[in-house]
């Protein structure tokens, strides 16, 4: 059953994918809120991205606050559509990021990427975030398929994909985008008609 049936009608009538990404710049789940990143997130982001444990499958850790500030502005704020800060509603603290990469408007697909402060691991928060965003994208944003690529050794991300309703579709080898080392990857997909 769709979580956002009235929004699907609205999307089909009025919006394209980019407009819907703008319309859903802010949304919530039970424990989390999602919003565009702002410069005031710089310290919470630095807490996350300066710790290599948080990013071992995403990108290299930053060394200084200045590097984090540059990352924040150039990677997350410069083109904000499809990029959300994950905020713990109880603490009003930015604890992670979830984003769409490789948005294909013609095929109505996007690849989902995310990371979470290690202090919040093991609580089901990333599963909640991925489920909420993927369901919203498939029911109200006009997406037909969401893709999630996980490193084979990233067991936590594989569990998030499975618990969020994604189906494993392939295993492949590829070069890590930062280290250029060959790694094994799993490709998961979630489609509009997935239950």
Identify the function of each model-found stretch.
Residues 73-85:
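A short helix-loop-beta-strand connector motif used in the catalytic cores of GNAT acetyltransferases and
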Residues 4-56, 83-195:
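Acyl-donor (CoA/ACP) binding surface of acyl/acetyltransferases
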Residues 53-74:
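Conserved GNAT-fold acetyl-CoA-binding loop/helix
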Residues 64-68, 76-78, 89, 115-117:
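Juxtamembrane/interface motifs at transmembrane-helix termini
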């Amino acid at each position: 059953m769709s979580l956002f049936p009235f929004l699907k009608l609205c999307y089909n009538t009025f919006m394209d994918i980019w407009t819907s990404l703008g319309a859903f710049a802010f949304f919530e789940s039970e424990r989390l809120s999602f919003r565009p990143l702002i410069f005031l997130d710089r310290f919470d982001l630095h807490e996350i991205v300066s710790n290599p444990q948080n990013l071992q499958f995403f990108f290299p850790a930053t060394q200084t606050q200045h590097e984090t500030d540059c990352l924040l502005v150039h990677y997350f704020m410069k083109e904000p559509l499809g990029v959300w800060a994950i905020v713990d509603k109880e603490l009003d603290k930015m604890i992670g990021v979830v984003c769409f990469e490789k948005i294909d408007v013609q095929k109505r697909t996007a690849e989902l990427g995310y990371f979470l402060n290690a202090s919040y691991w093991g609580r089901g928060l990333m599963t909640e975030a991925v489920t909420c965003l993927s369901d919203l994208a498939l029911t109200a944003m006009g997406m037909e398929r969401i893709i999630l690529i996980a490193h084979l050794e990233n067991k936590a991300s594989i569990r998030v994909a499975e618990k969020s309703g994604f189906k494993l579709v392939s295993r492949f080898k590829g070069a890590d985008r930062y280290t250029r080392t060959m790694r094994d990857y799993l490709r998961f997909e979630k489609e509009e008609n997935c239950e």
